[in-house]
Amino acid sequence: MNILMINATMKKGKSYTIGRALIDRIAREDDQVQEIFLPKDMPEFCRGCARCIREGEEHCPDYLIYLKRITGMIDEADLLIFTTPVFVYHTSGQMKALLDHYGYRWMVHRPEGSMFRKQAVCIATAAGAGMRSAIRDIRDSQIGRAHV
């Protein structure tokens, strides 16, 4: 199995720790585990230019520098694990910025068929409330996934 964990922050706090605990519990020795840390691996915000929708994702200004590698990792993964702390009842801005880059894959545009066969887990941690809304941010931005 190929597992990709996308971490909403560079900090290896509670969300990261829970994500790693899940991986340690389910991954076998021959499974491949990769991690993305935001914003290091994707520091750019979506510009809203819609070139990805009109011309193809390879025309995004951030495609060659960041998105080509991340998209390949997402497409190759069997399991996606999203980890995020809660910031004012929502996911981190950088997680939202990453997911905004995949708007071209929404159902109304060009859904990626391979996403329908993937499993995804969203992990959010908070000192109080807001975990449900943070997970909803990720779920609603999810690339063709109705149930995350």
Feature-to-residue mapping (PLM):
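Proline-centered loop/turn at the N-terminus of a beta-strand
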Residues: 119-121
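Short acidic/polar capping segments at secondary-structure boundaries
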Residues: 125-129
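N-terminal beta1-alpha1-beta2 submodule of the flavodoxin-like/Rossmannoid cofactor-binding fold
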Residues: 1-111
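Conserved small/polar residues in nucleotide/adenosyl-binding loops
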Residues: 146-148
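Short, surface-exposed alpha-helical segments at coil->helix boundaries
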Residues: 16-20, 131-136
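Short, conserved loop/helix-junction motifs that constitute active-site signature segments
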Residues: 111-117
